[in-house]
C-alpha cells in the first residue's frame, strides 16, 4: 500500500494537472466547434442564407433556397413590385395617377385577408405555407426539411414561411398577376444590438459593411454578389433579426471614401433628410427599383445629393391599358386608382425591355388608401394606412443604428460574450474556470515548496534567463495573434504625420491620394525602386481579384497603350499593386480645357485607345468596363508627346481557348451608362468582345462631341441604350471629319453585337487616316478604275448614289481657275464620281506644272490639296471606300481595309 501512495504523492498536483491537460486535449475538437452565437446570418434576394463570422466577416457556408421574391419577369401588363425586406407592395400606374405608388398592405397581410376582392372586380387569393429546416452550424449542410408530418432534434432549427398571392379578373380568362414571397421566422432582437456592431448594405448589389458604432471604422466587408434582404443572429435557441441600413452603392462609397470611415451622426426621431446636414451633405430616403433573375423588386435606400432621382408621379410611357371607371381606391381623398389596373407600354417599345426605365432611385411614392382589407382586419396590428404612412420615414431602429457617439454600451451578457469570444460557450467557460483553479493551486504549491526550501531558485529551476525571455516573447506573440479581430491593427506610423508607408519594395504617402474606386480601393502616389508609380491598394478580401488583375496585366502590359505593371506586395490588411503613373484621365482631357494635351489630338487619343483594346482582344481578354475614367494619359516622353493607356483590369475576363463569349453567372460587369445592351437584356445571351466595342463607341462620341453622351442624361441613359436609340446630333454636321466619324460611331453603337465592327476594323477606318493616305487612296482608286469598263459592277457601285456625293454637279463647287485648267485638256462629267477622282489624280500628278493661281487655290500637297476636295465633297471618301470594298483583298488596297479575319462589319448605312 505504501508504494501506490508514494507514487501518487510524486505527481500530485502536477500529475493531476497533466492528466487534465491530456483530457482537455482530447476534447479539443469539441471546444473549437463553431457555435451559432458566433455567426452572423445574412439572407440574400436569391434565397440563399449565408453564415459569416461575426468578427471577421469570413464566409463559413451558404444554404441555397428559392428566391425571396418571385414575380413576373417583365413589366408588360401588371406593374406590381414587392419589397423583399417586409413584403410591402407597390403599383406602377393607375387610371388617373401615373408613377410609382405604395399600397397600404403587405403580402402577408393580403394573404391573411384573402379571399378578398377590390372594387373593380379583381379577386385576390392567398396561400401560406410554413416549413422548418435543420442546418449543421459547422458545415452548413441541410440535414432535412420538417413539415407538420414529423419532428426531429435540430442543430439550427430555422423556420420559413412562404406567401403566395394571385390576382384573377373575371373579365379575362388569364391570370392577371401572381407573386411569391418568403421570409424567415425571426423576430427583431430586443435591446440595442446596433451599439456593438452596425451593418450597412448597398442596394442593387451584395456589399455588406460592418462598422464599429463608436469610431465609425469599417471592421470588415463582404461581397455576397446578390442584394441583402435580412441580417440575423442566433439568440436563445432561435433566429432573431438585426437592423441594418441600406444605402445606394454610390452613397456608401461616398461616405467611406470621403472620411475614410462611416461618419454618420447621432440622431433620434427626426426626419432623415435633416440628420446629415452636419456632414456637408444630405441623405434622403428613396425607393430603389431593381431587377434580378426572379423579377423586379423594390427596396428603401438612403442616397446622397449626387444621386439622380426619379420624381414622384413621373409618367414613364403613355398607357393604353383598359379603363376602370368604377374604382373606389383613393389617394389622399382626391385621386382615384386601382392596384389592379393594367400597365402597358407603347407597341413600338414592347419588343424592347422598356421596363428598364423603372430601374433607379425614386422619390418616396404616395400611398393608395383602400378599404379592401378592412373586411378582414388583422388582429393585433396597427392599421395598414397608419403603418404605410409611417413607413415613408426611416424606422426608429435605423436611428439607433446610426448612433455613433462613444458610450459604454450596456450589452446583454450573452451578446457580449458571444460577440467578443465567438468560440466559447457555457461548457467551455466551465472548463476554463476549472483549469484556472488548478493552475492557482499549482502556483500555491510551488510557493509553499519555495518557503520550505529557502535555497531553491526564485523561478522554475528548469528555465534559464534566455528560456524565460523566449517564453515572454512567445506569450506576447500569442497575445497579438489572439487579439480581437474587432480591434484594427495599428499601423507602424501616424497617417496624419504624412510619413510614407513602406510595404516591401513599394512606398507611398497615405495622404497623397490619386483616386478612389469601388470596394474600398484607393490609388496613391508612390515609389517603386526609385521610380514614381501609382500604388493601387485593395482590401485583403480581394485576393482573387488582385491575382486575376495582376495576371492579366502581366500578360498584356507589353503594349504601349496598356497600363504598365511593376510589382505586387501584400500587407496584413491590404494588397498593393505598383502601376505606371499617369498624369490625367480621358475625362479630364475632355472636360478640362486648360489641361496640357502633350500633342494628343482627339483622333490620336481614340486611335491609341483602340490600339490597346485590339491588343487585349488579340489575347482573348475582354475589358468589360471601358469608360473615360479608365482611359489614362501618360507622358510626356522625350519628344514631349503623350500616350494613352487602358487601365483598371478589375472586371476583365480572359476567354478560354476556343471560346469567344463569356457568361454572366458572376453578375453584370461594367458601369451603368457605358454597358452594352446585351449585358442587361433578358433572357441574357453570351456576350462577346463586342461589349467593349459598344463602350468604346460611347467613348468615341464623348471625345468627339466634347463631353456629350450618345444616350443622353444619366437618368435615362441605360434605358436609351436598351432601346438602341442614340442621339448623335454633335456629328450631324455635313463636314468631312464629322461624316466619317458618324459612320464609325454609328456602327460601334449598333444594338446587335454581331453588327458591330471588330477592334481591327475600327483601326482601319478612314477616321484615322492621314491626309496623305486619303490622297493616295483616291489616286489608287482612280488608277484601278481606268481598267474597268463603264458598265462594269465596280464602276456601277461607285456611281450609285453619286447625286449626293458630287452635290448634283461637282463643276459648280470648284473654283473658276481650276475649272478653266481642267477644260484645257479634256472634258469631265460633273455628275460622275469617277471623273471627279480622275480630275483629282491628274492635277496631283501634274501639280508642279499647274499655273500658280491654280496651285494657290488647291493648296500644298498633300494636306491642303486633299482638304480642298473633301471640304467641298464631305461624302466622297466614305462613298468611295464602300464602293471599293470588293477589292479589299487586292494587294493595292490592303493598306485601306482590315484583314479578312477582322472584316466583321455591318452593311453600309445608306446615306
From Swiss-Prot:
InterPro entries, sorted: IRE1/2-like, KEN_dom, KEN_sf, Kinase-like_dom_sf, PQQ_b-propeller_rpt, Prot_kinase_dom, Quinoprotein_ADH-like_sf, Ser/Thr_kinase_AS
Membrane-related topology note: Single-pass type I membrane protein
Reported cofactor(s): Mg(2+)
Record domain KEN: where: 771-899
Residue ranges constituting the Protein kinase domain according to the UniProt record: 508-768
Activity regulation (record text): The kinase domain is activated by trans-autophosphorylation. Kinase activity is required for activation of the endoribonuclease domain.
Record field: transmembrane: 427-447
EC numbers, comma separated: 2.7.11.1, 3.1.26.-
Positions of the catalytic residues: 625 (proton acceptor)
Gene3D superfamilies listed in its UniProt record: KEN domain, Phosphorylase Kinase, domain 1, Transferase(Phosphotransferase) domain 1, YVTN repeat-like/Quinoprotein amine dehydrogenase
Positions of glycan attachment: 178
Signal peptide: 1-33
Reactions mediated catalytically: L-seryl-[protein] + ATP = O-phospho-L-seryl-[protein] + ADP + H(+); L-threonyl-[protein] + ATP = O-phospho-L-threonyl-[protein] + ADP + H(+)
Spans within the Cytoplasmic topological domain: 448-911
Stated name of the protein: Serine/threonine-protein kinase/endoribonuclease IRE2
